[in-house]
Amino acid sequence: RVVETLIGAACALVINLVVVPPVQHEPAERAMRETAYAVADAYDRVAAALASHDAVDGERLLADARALRAHVQRTRAAMDALEESTRLNLRARALRERIARDERLLLTLTVLVNRVIGMSRTVADRFDASVADDPIVHRVGTEARRIAHGVRMLVDRHALEDGRTTTMPALDGPALTTPIAVPQPHPTHWVLIGALLEDVRQARESLEADGAGE
């Protein structure tokens, strides 16, 4: 009986290795990267809008930001398919830490999507080109570009860690710096600036937490 049990276990292992579908990690990785870069592009668009001295198409900006929700949903579906494919696959154990890390990244991207939607809505509803030269608005735009840079750098670093690439792409742009200090509220556009500051604060905090592996 012992021999029969061992033979049965060996057969089950072979069947598991041969018959069980492979781990579906490539679609999830591809969806995550596409979503991350789309989020980064959205922050770059906000930065460009804040620096514009011409009329800004706020409705288009907001529509593009809202479209990111579909990216997040597709990535969520791909991650669900990945996790489902690991349940019966013994070779998937090595991916557990990577999956947990990517779940954190997806949560970060979800927060960033919500924040860039908020910033885009603020621009659509309240932005006036006359404030493009305001120092605080300029800092918010700079920080939005830094967030975009940070998102791209984070997802590319993951690819390097996973062995999906051997080099880090050269990305132009500075990393996040210190939070923005406001000496005193703007006498006219304090609502606009306050809303932008809060969204960019939450975005940078979420990105910094993910970058630190929290």
Give the role of each language-model region:
Residues 101-214:
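Soluble C-terminal extramembrane regulatory/interaction domains of multi-pass membrane proteins
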Residues 1-64:
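A transmembrane helix-and-boundary motif of multi-pass membrane transporters/channels
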Residues 16, 20-23, 52, 56-58, ...:
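Conserved catalytic-core motifs characterized by acidic clusters
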Residues 26, 30, 34, 59-69, ...:
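A short glycine-/small-residue-rich loop at the edge of a beta-strand within enzyme catalytic domains
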